[in-house]
A protein has these predicted regions:
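Cell wall/extracellular polymer interaction/catalysis modules
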Residues: 28-122, 135-138, 145
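Exported/periplasmic cell-wall-interacting domains
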Residues: 63, 96-99, 103-104, 116-197
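Short, flexible active-site-adjacent loop segments at beta-strand->alpha-helix junctions, enriched
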Residues: 16, 74, 112, 153, ...
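Generic hydrophobic alpha-helical segments
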Residues: 17-18, 84, 115, 180
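Boundary at the C-terminal end of the N-terminal hydrophobic targeting segment
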Residues: 24-26
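Short N-terminal micro-motifs specific to bacterial/archaeal maturation
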Residues: 1-2, 68, 172
Length: 197
C-alpha cells in the first residue's frame, strides 16, 4: 500500500498552524501577556518543536485495527490507520506526575460519545471536594468523547479546558482537544492497539 506522504505532511503542517493559539505565536515576553501565559507559551513552543512524524514499525509489529502511540516526553499522540492511508499527530496532555503515569501496551475496549465521569478513589482522596459523579456536559473533564482502555480508569478523552493540552496536567489519562478526540474517535475502533511510552 502506497502511503500518501502529501496528506501526512499537510495534516502535520495544518495542525502546527491551526492548533497553536494566537498568543503562543506571539512574543513570549510582551507586556500584554501574564506570567502564566508566558509559561504556557514557552511550554507549547517547546512541545511543538519536538513533534516529529514517526514510522509505526519500531513500535508495533502490525497495524491490525489501527494503532495509537502516546509519547509522554513530546506530549503527542500518533495514530495510524490499519491500511496506512491515515497518519495523524495530535498534541496531548499527559499525567502530571510519574506516579500517575502508566506505560506499556493496551487497547481500546470501549468508545463513548458524551461520557459521564466518576473520579477514581485515589482522585477523591487527593481532592475530596470533587463530585462523585458528573454527567456529560461542558463541566465534564472527559470532554465530548472518550476511548476507554483495557487498563482500569485509563482513557484517551477530550477536554473542555484547552489550557491542559501540551502540559503535564492529567490524573493519568491522555487528553486531546475536543475537535481532535472527535476525529480520533471516528477513526478508531474497539481493538485499536495503544502503546504509551
Amino acid at each position: 500500500v502506497k502511503v500518501d506522504r502529501y496528506r501526512r505532511s499537510f495534516v502535520i503542517a495544518s495542525f502546527a498552524s491551526v492548533s497553536t493559539p494566537i498568543w503562543a505565536q506571539s512574543d513570549v515576553n510582551s507586556d500584554d501577556t501574564t506570567e502564566i501565559e508566558q509559561e504556557i507559551t514557552k511550554t507549547q513552543r517547546r512541545n511543538l518543536s519536538s513533534f516529529r512524524a514517526l514510522d509505526w514499525r519500531p513500535y508495533f509489529s502490525n497495524l491490525k485495527n489501527g494503532a495509537i502511540l502516546v509519547d509522554m516526553t513530546s506530549r503527542a499522540l500518533h495514530f495510524w490507520s490499519e491500511d496506512e492511508d491515515i497518519y495523524n499527530l495530535y498534541p496531548s496532555s499527559v499525567p502530571m506526575s510519574d506516579e500517575l503515569t502508566r506505560r506499556g501496551r493496551t487497547k481500546v475496549v470501549k468508545k463513548v460519545e458524551g461520557p459521564s465521569w466518576r473520579p477514581t478513589p485515589s482522585m477523591l482522596e487527593r481532592n475530596p471536594e470533587w463530585p462523585e459523579f458528573m454527567p456529560p456536559g461542558p463541566e465534564n473533564p472527559l470532554g465530548t468523547h472518550a476511548l476507554y482502555l483495557s487498563w482500569q480508569y485509563y482513557r484517551i478523552h477530550g477536554t473542555h479546558d484547552t489550557r491542559k493540552i501540551g502540559r503535564r496536567s492529567s490524573n493519568g489519562c491522555i487528553g486531546l482537544y475536543n475537535e481532535h478526540i472527535n476525529e480520533l474517535f471516528s477513526l478508531t475502533k474497539v481493538g485499536t492497539q495503544v502503546l504509551l511510552i
